[in-house]
């Protein structure tokens, strides 16, 4: 469930234990995705 194409919402069980991050890249501007908490 991790990747730039994943819309991170609290309803997604696969995002449990992960952090939601807003991208700042050009192609994925302000799109959210899940990643492991650093």
UniProtKB/Swiss-Prot annotation:
Pfam family, one: Toxin_22
Keyword terms of this UniProt record: Amidation, Disulfide bond, Ion channel impairing toxin, Knottin, Neurotoxin, Secreted, Toxin, Voltage-gated sodium channel impairing toxin
Any one GO MF annotation of this record: toxin activity
Disulphide-bonded residues: 1-15, 8-20, 14-34
Cellular compartments annotated: Secreted
Domain of life: Eukaryota
Keyword Secreted among record annotations: yes
Tissue: Expressed by the venom gland.
GO cellular component labels: extracellular region
Serine amide sites (modified residues): 38
The keyword Signal belongs to this UniProt entry's keyword annotation: no
Family: Belongs to the neurotoxin 14 (magi-1) family. 09 (magi-1) subfamily.
Other comments on record: Negative results: has no effect on lepidopteran larvae when injected at 20 pmol/g, or on mice when injected intracranially at 32.8 nmol/g.
Functional description taken from the UniProt entry: Insecticidal neurotoxin. Shows competition for site 3 of insect voltage-gated sodium channels (Nav).
Domain notes: The presence of a 'disulfide through disulfide knot' structurally defines this protein as a knottin.
Name of the molecule in the record: Mu-hexatoxin-Mg1b
Protein species of origin: Macrothele gigas (Japanese funnel web spider)
């Amino acid at each position: 469930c991790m990747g730039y194409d994943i819309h991170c919402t609290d309803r997604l069980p696969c995002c449990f234990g992960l952090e939601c991050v807003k991208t700042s890249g050009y192609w994925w501007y302000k799109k959210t995705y899940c990643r492991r908490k650093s």
